[in-house]
């Protein structure tokens, strides 16, 4: 998950209200950097940590040393769970967001919708995949296809170019893509530009996250927005309860919102 200005702002606003200062560190989704920063935060005896774990772990599992360190600190997670811990988490309804994305594509006339997947074993990806499959199943569409990537822009770009180059003008190509995150959706936009395919005339794309530059792409990306400012606020409120040993909800799930831009078009041609 990219660190987003609105999420950090939500954290800062609540912390300032209660007299806490904020130290922000960014792992760039690199596990080694994450481990190093956690050791640094522990050594500085911070009151608590709001953590979005590095996203490219196959099974969202931590090395034992890192897991022991986490258990010594006051922790609240955002977005990604950790196996082996009952840590409180603030997340979004990933199933519901994915479901609404695919229902939107269906309403726009698309019947061949590909799922551009993240890391298969992560809970985030699994919930979004379930939403995709459920939306198709409800309208009895048997055509489904999944292209596995890893949440990264460059990987999605390479996978799309390879897939479309192999099938070329096949009737089995999708007319729309639901991407498990915006970075991969942007990688797909880049790939289709190279393949000289028009978005949304030839292929439609919808992402998930509404990252800060998703409206700066060409065309601007239609996506599912996470309420990141509210997530930051809820994470701090929960962390303060953890610090003060008050009763907490172990999981806070927030709803998503469809943001309509220009990367999805109505499908008019029957394949």
Indicate residue ranges for each PLM-predicted region:
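Alpha-helical recognition/docking segments in bacterial nutrient-uptake
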Residues: 3-103, 107
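Hinge/beta->alpha junction and helix N-cap segments in small-molecule ligand-binding domains
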Residues: 4-6, 24-33, 55-58, 80, ...
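Short acidic/polar active-site loop segments enriched in Thr and Asp
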Residues: 47, 111-112, 175
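Short beta-strand segments enriched in small/hydrophobic residues
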Residues: 50, 112-118
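Flexible loop/turn connectors
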Residues: 144, 161, 165-271
């Amino acid at each position: 998950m990219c660190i987003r200005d609105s999420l950090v702002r939500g954290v800062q606003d609540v912390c300032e209200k209660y007299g806490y200062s904020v130290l922000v560190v960014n792992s760039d989704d690199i596990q080694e950097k994450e481990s190093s920063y956690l050791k640094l935060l522990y050594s500085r005896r911070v009151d608590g940590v709001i953590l979005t774990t590095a996203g490219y772990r196959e099974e969202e599992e931590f090395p034992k040393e890192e897991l022991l360190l986490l258990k010594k600190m006051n922790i609240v997670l955002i977005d990604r769970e950790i196996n082996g811990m009952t840590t409180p988490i603030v997340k979004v309804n990933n199933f519901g967001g994915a479901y609404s994305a695919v229902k939107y594509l269906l309403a726009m006339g698309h019947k061949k919708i590909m799922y551009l997947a993240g890391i298969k074993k992560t809970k985030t990806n699994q919930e979004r995949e379930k939403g995709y499959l459920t939306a198709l199943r409800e309208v009895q569409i048997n055509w489904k296809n999944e292209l596995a990537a890893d949440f990264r822009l460059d990987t999605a770009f390479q996978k799309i170019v390879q897939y479309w180059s192999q099938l070329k003008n096949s009737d089995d190509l999708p007319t729309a893509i639901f991407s498990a995150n915006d970075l991969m959706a942007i990688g797909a936009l880049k790939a289709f530009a190279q393949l000289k395919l028009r978005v949304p005339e030839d292929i439609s794309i919808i992402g998930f996250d509404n990252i800060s530059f998703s409206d700066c792409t060409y065309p601007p990306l239609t996506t599912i927005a996470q309420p990141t400012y509210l997530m930051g606020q809820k994470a701090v409120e929960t962390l303060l309860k953890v610090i003060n040993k008050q009763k907490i909800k172990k999981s806070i799930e927030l709803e998503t919102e469809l943001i309509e831009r220009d990367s999805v078009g109505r499908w008019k041609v029957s394949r």
